[in-house]
Amino acid sequence: GKTREEIAFLILGRASTPAEQKGDPIDAMLRIIGTRKREIIQRSCGDLIEFLDPSYGLDAVGGYDQIKQELMKIAATIKTGDRRLAPMGLLAVGPMGVGKTFVIKAFLKEAGLPGVVLKNFRSKWVGSTESNLERVLKIIRAMSPIALVIDEGDRSLGSGEGGDTDGGTSSRVIARIKDFMSDTDNRGHVLTILMTNRPDKLDVDIKRPGRLDRK
């Protein structure tokens, strides 16, 4: 049989770019596998999700000292692997342009969590929105541990907008996401991070503890 290094060399020599071959061969092999896995997932999901690949931690964030301290504590808790102590979700609130996404990406780096942004899962075709959402949620569960990031939550998860004009799709989507966020089987596996600049427009029930534990 071949050693791990020999297997890594064979993989690196046949299925990688020069950038992927840098550093330790085992680490490089794992990077290649991770990259290929993401490519397959993105192809299967179309433009429904986007991966976050932060290259910096919270030390790159200027100011926000109190917020950074709290996020460092949460990151440390997540890294212990104790599911009982992990929060179900985080709510990031602030006006546009204050750096919410930058801070969240830095937090994910500190916590060692990959992140996926929920994107255009809504569709003009009847039934497609809900099937799109189910497909994304199944993939996210399969990729755990992971962070599910929902940007502009006031738009996608607003308090019932569209319920009377889209056949109830909006209400069913919000209900499904609330169920997912409060599913205790996800604790320590899927961390939901909801970002918004208008928390007053969010469905009230979404903001309760057990879905978004930290604000």
Regions found by a protein language model. Give the residues of each.
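Walker A/P-loop NTP-binding motif of AAA+ ATPase domains
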Residues: L58-K215
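A diffuse structural propensity rather than consistent per-protein peaks
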Residues: D27-M29, G57-A60
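Interdomain "pre-motor" coupling segment immediately N-terminal to P-loop NTPase/helicase cores
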Residues: G1-E50
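AAA+ P-loop ATPase central domain
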Residues: D53-P54
